[in-house]
Design a protein with these regions (language model features):
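Terminal, non-catalytic domain-edge segments
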Residues: 80, 125-182
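A contiguous pocket-lining binding segment that forms or flanks enzyme active sites
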Residues: 55-86, 90
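Carbohydrate-binding/catalytic loop surfaces
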Residues: 1, 43-65, 106-127, 131, ...
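Well-ordered alpha-helical scaffold segments within catalytic/enzyme domains
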Residues: 4-19, 69-83, 127-141
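Long, well-ordered core segments of solenoidal/helical folds
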Residues: 25-45, 85-109, 146-163, 173
């Protein structure tokens, strides 16, 4: 999600320049995490827990890497400002991630690309693995760390890699048949 990535980048720029306008810009941009999709934000609720959408519209895309980037941006914003408002948005999102993590999990081996109905391509999966590892470390949430470890490509045997590749090909092609052409 660009909001989270941009917040993280602007916080780092602020640390280099001392320009407080950058922090104000981050806080203004972070307000989308407090608004529902219907109200022009990125906030949704699933199973009673908050999630942040990379693509805020219906049907909900539920793209994992965008959600993870949003959490890292909120973490950076809170760490810099100490504003409990952003800590609360971060905590709500982490609780939503923990409660809904199975949604993005393929048999404890790989990650799904949101609601698109196919497994993540390898480069997206590696990104999900790394971001989830970072969030597990930042939060101390063991469930995030365990899931990240289960997604480690280097820990997969030949049969698991073959299964993942075949399921990826099948689900990717099936999704292409379902999705309307632009």
């Amino acid at each position: 999600m660009y909001q989270g990535v941009v917040i993280s980048a602007l916080i780092r720029a602020y640390r280099m320049t001392g320009d407080r306008d950058l922090v104000a810009l981050c806080e203004a941009g972070a307000r989308v995490f407090e608004k529902t999709v219907e109200a022009g934000g990125v906030r949704t609720v699933e199973r009673g827990k908050v999630l942040y959408e990379e693509y805020p519209g219906y049907p909900l895309a539920r793209v994992l890497d965008g959600f993870l980037f949003s959490l890292l941006g909120l973490h950076d914003l809170y760490a810099e400002t100490g504003n409990g408002r952003w800590r609360e948005r971060f905590n709500e999102g982490v609780a939503g991630l923990v409660a809904n993590l199975d949604y993005w999990d393929y048999r404890g081996k790989w990650s799904w690309y949101g609601s698109h109905g196919y497994l993540c391509p390898p480069h997206y999966h590696k990104l999900n693995y790394l971001l989830l590892s970072i969030l597990g470390e930042l939060t101390g949430e063991e469930v995030l760390t365990r899931r990240a470890r289960s997604w480690d490509v280097n820990a997969k045997g030949r049969l698991d890699r073959m299964e993942i590749y075949l399921v990826y090909l099948i689900t990717q092609n099936a999704a292409r048949l379902r999705l309307p052409r632009q």
